[in-house]
Amino acid sequence: YIEKFIARLGERFNIREIAFDRWGAVQMVQNLEGMGFTVVPFGQGFKDMSPPTKELMKLVLEERVAHGGHPVLRWMIDNIYIRTDPAGNIKPDKEKSTEKIDGAVAPVMALDRAICCGNDTSESVYDNRGLLFI
């Protein structure tokens, strides 16, 4: 079901890359690659998570994120604890919660890929409309 949904999104949008957490994603990665998508591993540690987490927090504070008040996303965001390392890096974490945060971590990963492989020009669609969650 998820792969078919991603395929339909690929028909509507120019999906350049799909980031994935290496844990337990082997079959889905192979299937998405077989469908022609470029998939890239994305670590869940401070090194990979800190820059896009900081950027997303900045966009939220600037009120440049539109999520439509989605109740599941809101619930997952409420489950997040922002962990900080001694160097000042941050990342979303469940701390000791057993509740889900995946839907709140996915936009962090997607934002990183949008920044890394965004437009070739210096202009960004996010400069005018902000970040949109679908």
Label each region the model flagged.
Residues 55-64:
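Active-site proximal helix-loop segment of RNase H-like, two-metal nucleases, encompassing DDE(D)
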Residues 1-44, 50, 54, 67-134:
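RNase H-like, metal-dependent nuclease domains and their acidic two-metal-ion catalytic environment used
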